[in-house]
């Protein structure tokens, strides 16, 4: 390496380090406070639920902050998600329901996709507004279990499992699924599916027998969802904001309070997304409210 090349490499390394440091400091400062408006009683909270729902903690933290803020008269939630983990979706659902029950209005605006778990978290809102072309629905549960025994046989590798009882290694990728395994796992999926149905039936006031006819995992447009009673109205994010402002008695253009994620969450989300893309295929078994 000649001198000129060495100098160039050093300069690039210094610039990368400097940019990374500035970004880190900027994110840290942004995470220290939330974008609060001046007092005046014309504020709405604004929260986004985006991407695969894998962890509820940051969303729940933001929801609680909005619920406690006296300047926030109502909360507008933008959902742009195909769903995700069963537990994470239910925890977000429970927090939204708690806020609504305590008297602070919540309106959901559905984006391009608000399906399965994305729909699940929307159900406790006072009002759901979807775009006519929003992809929603997909009421159902999926469990994925890869079997890699054939691959191991090809490379000459064998895995021995010592277990306490017959069902202890159920779902193992190292052996074929038995009929007993399938029956037990189907029971788990069916139970979680029934929980999903019960939530939608209760929150949307749809009889179970009517709901079961459309809750077969199918996706639908926002317009179709409205016909089935799964959403309340069709409109844009601005329409949802206007409706919420009217519900809160706010005249004129309301100011939005947008919570900023904390720095640890930003990095954790980054690595989760990277892991999902690189190693998602081996994160099994898992059970999800998710549309592919």
Annotated model-derived regions:
Residues 125-141:
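Zinc-dependent metallopeptidase catalytic helix centered on the HExxH motif
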Residues 118:
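Pocket-flanking alpha-helical
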Residues 1-108, 113-114, 127-130, 144-292:
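N-terminal organellar transit peptides
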Residues 121-122, 225:
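Hydrophobic/aromatic residues within transmembrane alpha-helices
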